């Protein structure tokens, strides 16, 4: 995974990615009727606060001899953006969305306890000695529908539990609308519900034929943008921030990514020039750091599963069949053989004592 994403860095330095190929044109769903469905009836009002503009950071590529461009890994990060404290860069730092969701989770549990609310019929299936229940989502092949639900729920908690209303003009939908129809000012005073965020993201992923892995990388870029640019995602900017993160993630993850003009066919009223400008600003605010280590990706995947469990978004479980058990065993054996080959190669380079006995490992048996 890291190899593909590092290779994609070379494509992103100019703010626009050269295309390696182009897939068939996306479908054109009736999108406009869904995106701006009013949420005033059920949404919670939020007091508007003046937006504080944040100037994009100056980029210094350190031109040296022969106009050598400094690699992203060689540049020093600012002290306030230390990797150890940034969850989108460091695998040990806690994800922002999970910490923002804990307040609501604790309040919900406390309310259920005080009101003696019964959890009702258990829907989650547990394994026993005779039956093993597994879902169809793995870290390498997540379930698309469930992953989009989890990612949009994480975005929902980002908006609901934001610290302020700091934003940038390039992401402000009032300055750069996604539709020609005039959106009432009241629309921007209410937090969007989870179902509206899900509908917006699902429409883009369905029309552009994006994968579940792309959704996870989208969330990584979104949190990285909020941290680097020191802004908040709020009712006035969430659509353009999410759109920019999806646009960038699709180009990094997929060699035959959707073109900017294809997104214009999905959103219809947005121009290619606006998409290009937003992409350029997004990359500059990320300081062109589009690298997503495998450890960071895995952390976001498992934290999304924890978020789903806390909010009763259960994955679809099914009994382990004999055919799937054989497939899992074959995959495990292949990985084990590769690991043994690496160990042997390392031992050949490092052994200096005679009669060295390697570590014995027991074989796992699936029955």
Curated annotation (Swiss-Prot):
The modification Phosphoserine is found at residues 73, 111, 118, 352. It comes from the Eukaryota. Highly expressed in the testis. Largely restricted to germ cells in the testis. GO terms for molecular function: protein kinase binding. The keyword Membrane applies. Disruption phenotype: Deficient male mice are sterile, due to severe sperm structural and motility defects. CCNY and CCNYL1 double mutant mice undergo embryonic lethality beginning at embryonic day 14.5. At embryonic day 13.5, embryo display substantial neurogenesis defects including a thinner cerebral cortex and a reduced number of basal progenitors and postmitotic neurons. The keyword Phosphoprotein applies. Belongs to the cyclin family. Cyclin Y subfamily. This is Cyclin-Y-like protein 1.
């Amino acid at each position: 995974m890291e190899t593909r994403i590092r290779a994609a860095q070379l494509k992103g330095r100019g703010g626009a990615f050269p295309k390696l190929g182009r897939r068939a044109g996306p479908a054109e769903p009736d999108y406009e009727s869904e995106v701006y469905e009013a949420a005033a009836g059920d949404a919670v009002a939020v007091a508007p606060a003046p937006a504080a503009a944040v100037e994009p950071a100056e980029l210094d590529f350190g031109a040296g001899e022969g106009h050598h461009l400094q690699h992203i890994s060689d540049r020093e990060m600012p002290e306030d953006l230390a990797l150890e404290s940034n969850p989108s860069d460091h695998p040990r730092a806690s994800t922002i969305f999970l910490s923002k969701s804990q307040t609501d989770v604790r309040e919900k549990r406390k309310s259920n306890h005080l009101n003696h609310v019964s959890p009702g019929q258990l829907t989650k299936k547990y394994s026993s000695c005779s039956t093993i229940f597994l879902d169809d989502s793995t870290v390498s092949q997540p379930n698309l529908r469930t992953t989009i639900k989890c990612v949009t729920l994480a975005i929902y908690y980002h908006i609901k539990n934001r610290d302020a209303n700091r934003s940038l003009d390039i992401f402000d939908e009032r300055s750069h609308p996604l539709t020609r129809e005039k959106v009432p000012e009241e629309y921007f005073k209410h937090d969007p519900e989870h179902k509206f965020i899900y509908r917006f993201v699902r429409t883009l992923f369905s029309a552009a034929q994006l994968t579940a892995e792309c959704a996870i990388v989208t969330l990584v870029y979104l949190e990285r943008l909020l941290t680097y640019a020191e802004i908040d995602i709020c009712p006035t900017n969430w659509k353009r921030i999410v759109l920019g993160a999806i646009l960038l993630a699709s180009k990094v993850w997929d060699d035959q990514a959707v073109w900017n003009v294809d997104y214009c066919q999905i959103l219809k009223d947005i121009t290619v020039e606006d998409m290009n400008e937003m992409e350029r600003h997004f990359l500059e605010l990320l300081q062109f750091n589009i690298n997503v280590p495998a450890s960071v990706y895995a952390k976001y995947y498992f934290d999304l599963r924890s978020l789903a469990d806390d909010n009763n978004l259960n994955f679809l479980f099914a009994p382990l069949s004999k055919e799937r058990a054989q497939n899992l065993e074959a995959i495990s054996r292949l990985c084990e053989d590769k690991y043994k080959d690496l160990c042997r190669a390392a031992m050949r380079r490092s052994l200096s004592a005679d009669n060295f006995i390697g570590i014995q490992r027991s074989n796992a048996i699936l029955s």
